[in-house]
Structure formats: C-alpha cells, structure tokens
C-alpha cells in the first residue's frame, strides 16, 4: 500500500498514477488501434470533396451546332432542369456533338443523381431526332477532372482501326468494370467501319441519287427477327443471309438495274474498310495511337482505383498480339504517393526536431523519453478515429498531424515541467506527480478545449472548402484530445516512476552550460519585463500598433485561393483559326508536338484532334504533356509552361494554352487556363454584341494574361437557300434536300453490321477529292416527281456565311466563358477586383449577367467568409475561456495576444512572396490557438498566486511570467519546429504545404517576442479596470 502525503489528490490523474499497469495497457490499446487503423486507411491526394457530377454525351454526326442545340441539347436541358438537387447545368453544342454537364449539390448521393438523370433522359427520348445513331450516354464523371491514368496503344504492324477494335473489346471494357472508374474514353477513336464513298458523277450519269444508294444499302443489310417453325415433333429456328459483313460484299451489292444490266455499288462508289469517323486522330509522342484516358467517379479513391487497373493490365495485354504495345504514359497516383511520402517524412522530421528541443531544455534522458512517448502515441492513436470517420491518409490530414506534433507535446511538457519543479524542491516523485498533475490539470483542460474551439468554425465552413478542411480540422482536434488524455494519464504516471532528484540534478558540462544560458535569458527577460511593467502605456501603444499593422497587412497582401501544384502533368489546348479543317489541325499539332518533345523536362506527349465530346470543335486540339519526375528536371511546372509557350509562339496560325493539372478540380468543363469568368444573356445576339467589348477590355488589364473566350462565331458555313416554290413544283421536299446533303457530307451512319463481339457501322459520303470546297455542292442531285434527277442548283442558291462553331449554355441560357491566367506579380484577388471594376465601367445592361466560375467562384466565396471565420474562431474561444475561468475579463486578456500572431504570419507570407490563400488562412487560425497558450499559462499561475499566496496582481503576474518562461519558450519552439519542415518543403506537393509552414513559423516568431511583454501589461490593465468598476458599482461587489 502506497503512503501518500496529505493534500496530494492528483485530480483526474490520480487513478492513472496509482495504477501503472492499467495505464500502460490502456495506452497499448490506443497504440494497437492506431497501428491497425493506419493499415486500413486509404491513401489519397486530398479529402474526397468532389461535387456529384454526371456528363451526358449525344453524338449526331453531320449536325450543325444550331441543329444540335435545338434538336438535342434543348430537349435534354428542359428535362434535366426539373431535377431536384441540381446545382449547375452547363452544355456545349458543336458540330455533331452535344455535351451536357450536370453538377449536383454536395449532399446529394451520386447514385441518386444517376437515377434522376436516367429518368430525365427517358422522358426526353420522344423529343429527340428519330435518326440519332445512339441514344444519349451518361457517365458519372467530371469532364474537367484530369484522367487518373493515360495509356497509349500503338502498333507498327496493324492499322489503327484493328487496334481500336481490340482495345475496345478486350481492354477498355474490363477497365471500365473496375470499382471507382467513371469513364474510359478512347481518344482517336478509329472504330472499324465500311466506308462507301460515292462518285457523284457516276451516280448522276446513271440517273441515280445518293438517296437511292442509301435505301438500297439499308434494305440489303438487316438483322431482325424471323420467327421459327413449330412442328408436331421438332421446332426449327429461321435465319437468313441478311447480313453483309465485309467491304467486298458491299462492293458487289446490286443497287439498281440499267437496261437490264445490274449496277453494283462498286461501280459508283469506292467501298473500303476504314474508320467510322475520318476526322478523329490521336498521337502519342507523334506516333499514331489509341489513347485511353481513365477517369474516376466523383468520390472514388484514386489510389485504389489505379492499383486495381495496374494489377489487371498484365493479364489484359497478354490477350493482344505481340505487335500491339500498351504504354502507361501518365499515372497521377505516382505523384500522389510521392507527395504523401514526402509529407510523412516531414512528419517524422517534425517529431525528431520536437524531441530534440525537449532534450535541449530538459537535458535529461528520462524526462525526454516521457514526451517522446506521448507524441507518437497521440499521433498514432488518431489513425484509429480516422478509420471510424472514413477519412484517408492525404496531404491535409498528414499536414494536420505534422502541425499537431508541436501541439501535442505542449501538454506533456507543461506536466513534466511542473512535476519536475516539485521534485527539485525535494518532494518524492509520486507525491510530486500527484501534486503537479493535480495543479496543472485545469490548465491542460483549458489549453485543450480553447484550442479545439479554434477549429470549430472550420467544421461549419460551407460548400467545397468546408468539406475539404473538415478532415484537417477533425484530425487535428482528435490528436489534441488524445494528447490531453495521454498528458493527464500516462505522462504523470511515467514521471512518478522515471524521474527522481538524482536524475534531474545529474548534469554534465553541456547541461551546466545550457542551464547557465537559460538562467541568463530568464534574468534578462525579468529585467526587461520589470521595465515594461513600469511603462505600461508604451507597451499598450505597441500592442495597438500591432493591431493596426495586422489590419493594414491584411488589406495589402496578395490573396489567392489554392496553391498551384506541380503534379508533373500539363493540360493544353491548341487553338487555330475558326475555319481550320481536320487535315490542317493534324498538321499543326505535328509541328507543335515536335517543339514540345524537344524540351528537356518533357517525358511524353499525347495529342488529339477531332470532335468527340471531349473536344468540341475541329479548330482545336487537346494535349497532355507528361513531365519527368521532379527530381529529374531542373524547373518547376510554371517555368516549363513558359518555355513551351515561347517555343511554340513562332508557329504561325496557332495559340497554345497550357495549365498544370491540380488535385482539386472545381470546374465542370475543360478550360484553356486556370480561371474562368462567364457572361450570360437571354439571346445569342446580345452575347455577340457584348463579348468582343468585354474581351477587349479584359485583354487590356495588366492583372490578367492569356485572356480568351469560347465564343467562336466566325466559322465558315454554306447556307443552302432553297426556293420552296420551285422545289414543290418538282415534288422535292425539304426532307429530300436535307437527306441528300446528309448522305453526301455528314459521314452518315446508314446501317449496322452485327457480330458476336461488337457492332460496326456503314458510313455513306461523297468522294470530294476531285471537287473540294463549295464546288462539291454542285454534284448534289435530287429525285423529282417524274423520277428524273434535278441538280441542287436548280432549286437552291448557295451563300457563304459565318456561323458559330459551338453554342454554350449555362442553366439553359446562352453563355460565353472567358478564360484567363494571373501573370507574375499579381494575385487572383487583384485579377478578380480588376474584372469587377471593368464590369462596372462597361455598364452592362440588366439582361446581361456575369459570374465567376470554378475555382474563381470558390475563391470569392472563401474570401467573403474568411473574416467571419476568424471572428467565429475568436468568439468560440472567448466563450470556452469565459466558461472555464468564470470571467468576462480574463478571456479578453488571453485573446489580446492574437494580433501579434497575425502580424507575424502576414509579414512572413509577404517576405516569402506567398499569397494569402486558404492554406495560409488555416495557418493563421491555428496560430490563434497556439499563441493564446502563452497567455493561459501566465494567467493561470498569476490567478493561483493571488488566491493561494495573497500576492498583489503585479507580483503575481511577474512571478508567473518568470516561472512559465521556460515551458512557454519550450512549447513555442516545439510548435515552430513542428511547422518548420512544412515551410522548408521542396518535394512533390510542397506548394500545398509551404504556406501553412510559413504562416505558422512567422506568426510564432513574432508572437513569442511580443506576448511575453504585452500579456502581463494587459492583465494588469484589466485588473485595474475591474477594480474601478467595482468601486463605481459597489452593488456588484456585494452580489459577488
């Protein structure tokens, strides 16, 4: 039975100090649960914050943007607009393709959104054109989200059509079945087909038309039910040779008779095996390829999805011929893993630095071991709670744990320092542990709950930013809570068993030198503090000046949204004149690709030309540039982008827009640059009037660079103006005219070839090699009422006009999106303000609306809520401190330290050339929690000295400052060194971590110096104020 001195209660720690075995086993359980949790946690770049997004693609080869808008997009939009939970609907209608992107509220499950989309498509089916080759196809994917993996399939022995067929049937389908995969697209889509190229002159010479040929082909190739014979004993299934499978069979097809002689299709057309769409092409490192882009579902775990695909690839490639090569060109998870590893290393480095600081101050191995055990135990135990909350190991949660390193050690240091003080006075270790832990218990609780109060507003941040930082805040809060538990249980128990007067007094030369140094520092601080207390108004002036300076710095500092990351992948758009053809774009992309591949930082390149839903117009091309690993190149991604744009600038007739891919994607459409601003009107005419004016104004702003818009209304169009009276007299309808034009120039899919594995199309078109351009229209002939043929020119006049290449809608109304980057020397905040000022200058009419999109819109929302977020953090902390101290005054004293943290953080960011972005703001909020710890430790001891020893307020706060100087310095340095690895980070993802480290290190350095002097002065000021109030209102004193 242990004999305890009287009064050694130990508070909440008593039970754990007296039961070391139970305490040890409890901590072992926490450790084991954390280790198991770590192994179960998935790995990701960031928390899953994707909006539920679904893309609906409808292909209608040959249809103009106007036809796609009115006949396809508009009916779909009307049905989609009725869905509940829809946040935003955007669409793009271009030649032959309609893409509708539906973004839902964060709270709506993706499966529910999928059901609503399917129901809306079903409701719109009867409103869509009857000759659509395929119904609308939806995918659970955000088109702006870069692919998680890009594979190139090439062959030096097989045509791309055969390669595409094998990839589609043997590889793409299997990858699509992987859990987490939202969409697998085959860029360059050279699907096999039978192409029928009519010779217009030969057809006309025989008195035939393209419609005659089309009817003959569709009637000769069918695949329908034929029934069966059911006899008395046997049943017989009926089948026939109604399918034609090869180009040779179609070539021999009889389409008409002339003078009793058969006219075969091969007599009037070139029939060959080819590609379904001859205006699509993809290249990998300039070699023709089928480029397979794998996109994940919103919310899917990117690491698990990519791992499943890689495990499957060897088996899939074995089924392909040896001449077919599958190459993984990019895998976003490579950089994600590297970034997470770097952050894990920084976490371990932070732990090592914190333990080093502890040893430097305590200079005692047993005393160093105790917090050295508490830190990893608190961090590892957090993993168990993270599993329960469905969190992941990502950059933000690891950053939270790295910052927590400096937080969690504070509690252990405060406990050890207080217990050690009693042991050095001669008390037994057990009694000292009980007394010291009991005395410091309230302080630990105050520190813990006031720090968690700072994090509470983060949990209530709205929209995607709030969802993003929820894991950060909760992870940090859990680590702090576990730390408090460990500090009140394990730490005093270990102190009672491991510390003694002999071990604490045992010193070597190094220890004695450090002790002398600390004594001199404390003595100097005491002399300085005495002078400060004698001149309080000067100190108060400094505190007030600090507050004003923090406000001024907040106003002038450049503001951003989210750090631009170097993930080693660059997305690009190549833009050419609006009338550019597929052939000219293919040639231009070859020139650009040659320049890009010469850059030493580039590892591989994929390019794509054509219209397929991902790319909207023929005059644009998509690029994906994969850079070498960061440690294998000399330049960061922005420097590479500048160099590539300079290299391509000398190629005439092209504009290259590049942007680095990011882990956080908020946009719903692929953009040319990082930021977007939309202009919306009720009519296209209103847009056409204001778009040039606004674009010219934006291009003149120095705060913006690479300004462009998706407004393209100068595409060449041939307007067929039919004389309806003449056509009617000849018995020719508008449907006949449309069919004739579609047969000739629409790559019309007129029939389907069915096989056991796939379906292939028969494509009809005119061979325009000998009659390019508008001259090809002169070859069109139509069947008149009397059975003869009439040239199109007999009933129509051809006019050349300008027409839009694409028509974009936002929530069913016409819209144009301006894309821009922010040049060096300016911030996103500067650009946003410049755009708003320009909008006011132009005085846009009421029927014209503007709105920022994507990350720019999120920046506006975050910027508007930042001040309120900080205010909410301060108010929450005031409430918690007021409840703990049962005082209205003391919480104000503690919170008076906050401006010093803001000044230091903002100055550090400005000196480092960093913007005040979301990450840096989180750092400032955390500083609020750290800096007030110094004041809490001072005020707690001052109040205790006044109550228990009857000291005057001045003597009490003076003694408290001296007694708590060492633990304050120790805990501040621990927090500073915990953030230092983040500030000095240089690896993959360093852009994300560095602002947090800079803000915290700068804030801690400045606040450490100032709060040691301003806090006692403000404490005495409020004490005098309290006495004054009591003297003026004695009733308050009586009631008290």
UniProtKB/Swiss-Prot annotation:
One of its GO terms (cellular component) is plasma membrane. GO terms for molecular function: xenobiotic transmembrane transporter activity. It is a multi-pass membrane protein. The chain crosses the membrane at residues 16-36, 347-367, 369-389, 396-416, 440-460, 472-492, 537-557, 863-883, 888-908, 910-930, 968-988, 998-1018. It is found in: Cell inner membrane. InterPro entries: AcrB_DN_DC_subdom, Acrflvin-R, Multidrug-R_MdtB. Keywords: Cell inner membrane, Cell membrane, Membrane, Transmembrane, Transmembrane helix, Transport. Its main location: membrane. The keyword Cell membrane applies. It holds the Pfam family ACR_tran. Belongs to the resistance-nodulation-cell division (RND) (TC 2.A.6) family. MdtB subfamily. Part of a tripartite efflux system composed of MdtA, MdtB and MdtC. MdtB forms a heteromultimer with MdtC. PANTHER family: MULTIDRUG RESISTANCE PROTEIN MDTB, PTHR32063. This is Multidrug resistance protein MdtB. The lineage of its organism: Bacteria, Pseudomonadati, Pseudomonadota, Gammaproteobacteria, Enterobacterales.
């Amino acid at each position: 039975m242990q004999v305890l001195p009287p009064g050694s209660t130990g508070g909440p720690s008593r039970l754990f100090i007296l039961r070391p075995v139970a305490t040890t086993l409890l901590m072992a359980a926490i450790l084991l649960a954390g280790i198991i949790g770590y192994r179960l946690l998935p790995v990701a770049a960031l928390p899953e914050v994707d909006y539920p997004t679904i893309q609906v693609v409808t292909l209608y080869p040959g249809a103009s943007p106007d036809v796609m808008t009115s006949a396809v997009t508009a009916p779909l939009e009307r049905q989609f607009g009725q869905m509940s939970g829809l946040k935003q609907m955007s669409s793009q209608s271009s030649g032959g393709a309609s893409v509708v992107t539906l973004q839902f509220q964060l709270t709506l499950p993706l499966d529910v959104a999928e059901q609503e989309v399917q129901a809306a498509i079903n409701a719109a089916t009867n409103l869509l054109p009857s000759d659509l080759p395929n119904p609308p196809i939806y995918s659970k994917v955000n088109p702006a989200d870069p692919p998680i993996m890009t594979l190139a399939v090439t062959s030096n022995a097989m045509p791309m059509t055969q390669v595409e067929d094998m990839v589609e049937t043997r590889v793409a389908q299997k990858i699509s079945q992987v859990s987490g995969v939202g969409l697998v697209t085959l860029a360059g889509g050279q699907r096999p087909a039978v192409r029928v190229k009519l010779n217009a002159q030969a057809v006309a010479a025989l008195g035939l038309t393209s419609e005659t040929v089309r009817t003959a082909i569709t009637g000769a190739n069918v695949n329908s039910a034929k029934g069966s014979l059911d006899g008395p004993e046997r049943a017989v299934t009926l089948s026939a040779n109604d399918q034609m499978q090869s180009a040779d069979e179609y070539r021999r097809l009889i389409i008409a008779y002339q003078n009793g002689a058969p006219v075969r299709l091969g007599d009037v057309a070139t029939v060959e095996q080819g590609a379904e769409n001859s205006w699509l092409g993809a290249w990998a490192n300039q070699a023709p390829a089928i480029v397979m882009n794998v996109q994940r579902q919103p919310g899917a775990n990117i690491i698990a999805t990519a791992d499943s695909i890689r495990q499957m690839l060897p088996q899939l490639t074995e089924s392909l011929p040896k001449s077919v090569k599958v190459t993984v060109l990019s895998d976003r998870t490579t950089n994600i893993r590297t970034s997470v590893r770097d952050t894990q290393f920084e976490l371990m480095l932070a732990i090592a630095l914190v333990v080093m600081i502890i040893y430097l101050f305590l200079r005692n191995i047993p005393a160093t071991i105790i917090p050295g055990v508490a830190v990893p135990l608190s961090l590892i135990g957090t993993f168990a709670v993270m599993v329960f909350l469905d969190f992941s190991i990502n950059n933000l949660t690891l950053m939270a744990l790295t910052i927590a390193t400096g937080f969690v050690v504070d509690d252990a240091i405060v406990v050890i320092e207080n217990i050690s003080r009693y042991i050095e006075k001669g008390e037994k270790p057990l009694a000292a542990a009980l007394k010291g832990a009991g005395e410091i218990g309230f302080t630990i609780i105050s520190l813990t709950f006031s720090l968690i109060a700072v994090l509470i507003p983060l949990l209530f941040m709205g929209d995607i930013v709030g969802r993003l930082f929820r894991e950060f805040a909760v992870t940090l809060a859990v680590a702090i809570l576990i730390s408090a538990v460990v500090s009140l249980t394990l730490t005093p128990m270990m102190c009672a068993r491991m510390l003694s007067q002999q071990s604490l007094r045992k010193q070597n030369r190094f220890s004695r030198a450090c002790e002398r140094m600390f004594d001199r520092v404390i003595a100097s601080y005491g002399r300085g503090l005495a002078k400060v207390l004698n001149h309080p108004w000067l100190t108060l002036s400094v505190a007030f000046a600090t507050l004003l300076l923090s406000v001024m710095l907040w106003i002038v500092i450049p503001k951003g949204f989210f750090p631009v990351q170097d993930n080693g992948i660059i997305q690009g758009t190549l833009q050419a004149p609006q009338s550019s053809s597929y052939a000219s774009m293919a040639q231009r992309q070859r020139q650009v690709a040659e320049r890009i591949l010469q850059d030493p930082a580039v590892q591989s390149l994929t390019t794509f030309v054509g219209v397929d839903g991902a790319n909207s117009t023929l005059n644009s091309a998509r690029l994906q540039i994969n850079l070498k690993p960061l440690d294998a190149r000399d330049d960061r991604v922005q420097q590479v982008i500048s160099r590539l744009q300079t290299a391509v600038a000398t190629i005439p007739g092209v504009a290259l827009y590049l942007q680095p891919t990011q882990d956080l994607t908020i946009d719903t459409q692929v953009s040319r640059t990082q930021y977007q601003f939309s202009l919306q009107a009720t009519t296209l005419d209103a847009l056409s009037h204001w778009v040039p004016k606004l674009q010219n104004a934006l291009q003149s702003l120095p705060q913006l660079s690479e300004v462009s818009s998706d407004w393209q209304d100068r595409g060449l169009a041939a307007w067929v103006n039919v004389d309806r009276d003449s056509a009617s007299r000849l018995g020719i309808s508008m449907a006949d005219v449309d069919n004739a034009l579609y047969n000739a120039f629409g790559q019309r899919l007129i029939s389907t070839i069915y096989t056991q594995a796939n379906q292939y199309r028969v494509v009809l078109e005119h061979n325009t090699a000998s009659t390019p351009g508008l001259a090809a229209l002169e070859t069109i002939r139509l069947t008149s009422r009397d059975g003869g043929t009439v040239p199109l020119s007999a009933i129509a006049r051809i006019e050349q006009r300008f027409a839009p290449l694409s028509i974009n809608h936002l929530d069913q109304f016409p819209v144009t999106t301006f894309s821009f980057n922010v040049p060096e020397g300016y911030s996103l905040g500067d650009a946003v303000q410049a755009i708003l000022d320009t909008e006011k200058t132009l005085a846009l009419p009421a029927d014209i609306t503007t709105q920022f999109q994507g990350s720019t819109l999120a920046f506006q929302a975050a910027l508007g809520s930042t001040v309120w977020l900080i205010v909410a953090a301060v108010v929450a902390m005031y409430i918690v401190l007021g409840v703990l101290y049962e005082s209205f005054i003391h919480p104000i004293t503690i919170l008076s330290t906050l401006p010093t943290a803001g000044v230091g953080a903002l100055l550090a960011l400005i000196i480092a050339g960093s913007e005040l972005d979301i990450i840096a703001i989180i750092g400032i909020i955390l500083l609020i929690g750290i800096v007030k710890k110094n004041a809490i430790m001072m005020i707690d001891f001052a109040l205790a000295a006044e109550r228990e020893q009857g000291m005057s307020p001045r003597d009490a706060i003076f003694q408290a400052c001296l007694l708590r100087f060492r633990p304050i310095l120790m805990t501040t340095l621990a927090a500073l060194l915990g953030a230092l690895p983040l500030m000095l980070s240089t690896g993959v993802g360093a852009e994300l971590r560095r602002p947090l480290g800079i803000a915290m290190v700068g804030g801690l350095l400045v606040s450490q110096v100032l709060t040691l002097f301003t806090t006692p002065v403000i404490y005495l000021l409020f004490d005098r104020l309290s006495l004054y109030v009591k003297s003026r209102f004695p009733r308050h004193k009586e009631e008290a």
